[in-house]
């Protein structure tokens, strides 16, 4: 687990930022008329995905450590996972700021790229677990 320590620490550091995002959303909603209903929807989606995926990352590192992957492959898998988390949740925030109702935007594209990165990272983990001695 020592080899993955930096990734674990980064996830734990990122978690309070997601918590602060929830506080920020609540403050904006309570002020009223700051965000449109469209913006609130996409802010919530980005916030929820960031929180859930960050918690998933902590499990991911635990299981990745049980594989027989080399340290380089483990770090590559972690980097792919983190990039996927940032793109998946960040795309929702970008869509909130730049998108329009019922239309795709650059945020939508980034969210899809994030989902693909997450699938790649999870597929690597599954492969590593299946082939572990």
Where are these regions (language model features)?
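Polytopic transmembrane helical bundles with strong interfacial aromatic enrichment
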Residues: 1-133
């Amino acid at each position: 687990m020592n080899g993955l320590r930096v990734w674990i620490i980064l996830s734990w550091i990122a978690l309070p930022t997601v918590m602060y995002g929830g506080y920020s959303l609540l403050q904006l909603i309570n002020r009223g008329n700051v965000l449109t209903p469209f913006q609130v929807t996409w802010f919530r989606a980005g916030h929820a995905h960031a929180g859930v995926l960050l918690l998933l990352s902590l499990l991911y590192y635990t299981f990745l450590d049980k594989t027989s992957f080399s340290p380089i492959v483990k770090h590559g898998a972690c980097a792919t996972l983190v990039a996927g988390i940032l793109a998946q949740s960040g795309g929702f925030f970008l869509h909130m700021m730049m998108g329009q109702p019922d239309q795709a935007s650059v945020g939508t594209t980034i969210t899809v790229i994030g989902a693909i990165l997450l699938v790649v990272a999870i597929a690597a983990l599954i492969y590593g677990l299946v082939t572990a001695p």
